[in-house]
Amino acid sequence: MQYKIKNAVQIKKFSDYYKITVCKNITKGKKSTKFVPKGKGGNNKKLSNSISRSKKQVLEKALCNEWLWFATLTLDPKKYVRDDLKTFIKDLGQFIRDQRKKYKDVKIKYLLIPELHADGKNWHLHGLFSDIPIADIEPHPLKKLSEKGYINWVTYQDQFGFNSLGAVKDPVKCSMYITKYISKDLDKAVTALDQKLYYCSRGLKTAEIVAQGRLTQPINFKMAFEGLYSKSQFVDDYEFFKCYYIDDKF
């Protein structure tokens, strides 16, 4: 049987940060089975939940792991059919496995999100890499990019096409930024192709729940994000927040 918990608090540890989240209501317990007719409303809710869930997963993986490079990976039409996302992902996965075998001391991990070009047909990828073999990189051949510190992954260019990698300078801002690529349009596009909203290495770290409970008094400060149903904020330490809630395992 389902039941609601008001003013629920959850605190998660993200590597060097903590995220405090307060929800007006959360639903716990087993949902009773009932008939729900198919229709536009149900599909829209399912779509919204898929996007929200994927954004949270990407943010967790981005914040809980160490990344050196923000990457944009494209396809050269002379080398690949640019609208074939399935083949792109499959071959890129094999390419990365080959790189790991060749450079065994380089731990290549990735978190990538597909995006359609403005033409609504062809694909490229944005995302994060933990490391790239030094022997395989060079200053970017485009002057406007090399002047900003971007590099070129030479072996990727040889097999796939244009790419650019920039150093991750602010992990939190970069992690927040990449979630913007997960959108309603992307969900529809990848669903039609039976593909995913994002791709990542196995074994990436995720956030750990370190505390949860219920508010015991109103919060007397504004949190960084405040929506209709929840509010949240990243902090270095949550000791100051302990006076606002009581522990509860739900």
Spans of features found by a protein language model:
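Right-hand nucleic-acid polymerase module
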Residues: M1-K121, I132-F250
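Cys/His-coordinated zinc-finger cores
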Residues: L125-F129
